[in-house]
């Protein structure tokens, strides 16, 4: 079990998948949201939670005022845990899409998001994450001002952000590194 840190569901516990996932620690999640909310008010934002795992990042965003979160998770057991967590918390605005992150991002959208949260398994190659970041921009997921946060192991190669993103200072918490960037201009 882990818990929601802040907002209307703050302090409530949520389930985590039984094996094969590495939920973001409370400390890292709290720091992540402190960094983002120092620059952006979450109220009313549209959020994309990639490699959602337990859904903790997206649920934290909903608890703190985001209008909507699209959770993307390929593992069926993890997706079932996300669905149960959404129901247990009773937060509106949650949509769960079961499927591979690369396929969902490649399919595109006509509704860009304001915040992208990505916590890929540490064994996902940095080049694959780089490709996802590039596809977000070319497939309509981002707009000027979109913020992206990617959680990686400190042992993983740093990300190569596509043109049009301004990196924010990265943060390191033990063996976890947060890489953040802001979209400078609309999709091309």
Swiss-Prot record:
Location of the region described as Linker in the Swiss-Prot/TrEMBL record: 17-24
Gene3D superfamilies: Vaccinia Virus protein VP39
GO biological process: rRNA methylation
EC number: 2.1.1.-, 2.1.1.171
Effect on the protein upon substituting residue 13 to A: Does not show any significant binding to either DNA or RNA in vitro and lacks m2G966 methyltransferase activity in vivo
Mutagenesis or variant effect for residue 176 to A: Shows reduced nuclear localization
Localization per Swiss-Prot or TrEMBL: Secreted; Host cytoplasm; Host nucleus; Host nucleus, Host nucleolus
Pfam families tied to this protein: Cons_hypoth95 (PF03602)
SUPFAM superfamilies hit by this protein: S-adenosyl-L-methionine-dependent methyltransferases (SSF53335)
Chemical reaction(s) catalysed: guanosine(966) in 16S rRNA + S-adenosyl-L-methionine = N(2)-methylguanosine(966) in 16S rRNA + S-adenosyl-L-homocysteine + H(+)
Activity modulation comment: Phosphorylation stimulates DNA binding and DNA methyltransferase activity, but does not influence secretion. Exists in a compact, folded state at both pH 7.5 and pH 4.0, the acidic pH that mycobacterial proteins may encounter in the host lysosomal or endosomal compartments. The protein is more compact and stable at pH 4.0 than pH 7.5.
One Gene Ontology term, aspect cellular component: extracellular region
Posttranslational modification: Glycosylated. Phosphorylated. In vitro, is phosphorylated by multiple mycobacterial kinases (PknA, PknB, PknD, PknH, PknJ and PknL) and by mammalian kinases.
Keyword annotations: Host cytoplasm, Host nucleus, Methyltransferase, rRNA processing, S-adenosyl-L-methionine, Secreted, Transferase, Virulence
Miscellaneous comment: Can complement rsmD-deleted E.coli cells.
Known partners and oligomeric status: Monomer. Within host cells, interacts with histones H3 and H4.
Family: Belongs to the methyltransferase superfamily.
Function according to Swiss-Prot or TrEMBL: SAM-dependent methyltransferase that binds both to RNA and DNA. Specifically methylates the guanine in position 966 of 16S rRNA in the 30S particle. In addition, can methylate and modulate host cellular DNA within an infected mammalian cell, altering the host epigenetic machinery. Binds to specific host DNA sequences and methylates cytosines predominantly in a non-CpG context.
Protein name, UniProt field: RNA/DNA methyltransferase Rv2966c
Organism: Mycobacterium tuberculosis (strain ATCC 25618 / H37Rv)
């Amino acid at each position: 079990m882990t818990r929601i840190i802040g907002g209307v569901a703050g302090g409530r516990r949520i389930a985590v998948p039984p094996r094969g996932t590495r939920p973001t620690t409370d400390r890292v999640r709290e720091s992540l949201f402190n960094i983002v909310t120092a620059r952006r008010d979450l109220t009313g934002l549209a959020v994309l939670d990639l490699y959602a795992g337990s859904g903790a990042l997206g649920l934290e965003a909903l608890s703190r005022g985001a209008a909507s979160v699209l959770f993307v998770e390929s593992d069926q057991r993890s997706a079932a845990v996300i669905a149960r967590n959404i129901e247990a918390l009773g937060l509106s605005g949650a949509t769960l899409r079961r499927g591979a992150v690369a396929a969902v991002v490649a399919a595109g959208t006509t509704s860009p998001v304001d915040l992208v949260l990505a916590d890929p398994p540490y064994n996902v190659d940095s080049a694959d994450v780089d490709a996802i970041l590039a596809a977000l921009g070319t497939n309509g997921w981002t707009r000027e001002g979109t913020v992206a946060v990617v959680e990686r192991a400190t042992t993983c190669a740093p990300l190569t952000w596509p043109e049009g993103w301004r990196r924010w200072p990265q943060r390191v918490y033990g063996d976890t590194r947060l890489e953040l960037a802001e979209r400078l201009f609309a999709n091309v």
